[in-house]
């Protein structure tokens, strides 16, 4: 954990957040105002890093930092290891879940980080052969799930259970709600608009559709914006 200091300024007192010059800090997905994250994208995203590895290039781990609000404490929950690359984190049940793929060892690791422990603990380990590639390999909630949406009109649930079904290329998963998956879909006909599609697991059949977008708020409430 790095120390957070106050610096004198002609404008006002400022809290210094030292994350090695990485300026792309943003909120962790999943409805929290408590956690932010930043990474250096040294090889681009997870899929781009995988392509480099498959082409025989060395892959260094990206550095991923979690920043806690309001105290400004900075954590590096997963130590960098050559051949490893980190995906997007997500907030789940009071902890931050992290995705780490080790191309050298051919494994996918899912980890949880809590501020009390200050280190991430592994909760699942899968062979990398479980997926064709890491294109759109992302963690979602809730419950915590590993999903993949390749650019071929299919959706895959990889963990904790398996499911696969067809969907529109204009759909993207917003969140999971038990045995239901809530997708955003956009249209241009000709005006731009968005809808929510609620699909059932495991077959993906559509249960509901309605205009708007559901946002998960910091207190866990879901707001339908329309």
Where in the sequence are the language-model features?
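Residue position within the beta-strands of beta-propeller blades
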Residues: 36-40, 97-100, 145-148, 182-185, ...
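Surface-exposed loop/turn elements that mediate protein-protein interactions on large endomembrane-trafficking
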Residues: 2-25, 48-80, 104-130, 147-173, ...
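N-terminal "first-domain core" detector
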Residues: 26-44
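Blade-loop segments of beta-propeller domains
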Residues: 71-97
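Long, charge-rich C-terminal accessory regions
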Residues: 135-143, 148-152
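Short coil/turn segments that connect the beta-strands within blades of beta-propeller domains
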Residues: 32-35, 93-94, 141-144, 178-180, ...
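Low-complexity, Pro/Ser/Thr- and charge-rich linker/hinge segments at domain boundaries
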Residues: 134, 169-170, 178
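Conserved beta-strand position repeated across blades of beta-propeller domains
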Residues: 29, 90, 138, 174-175
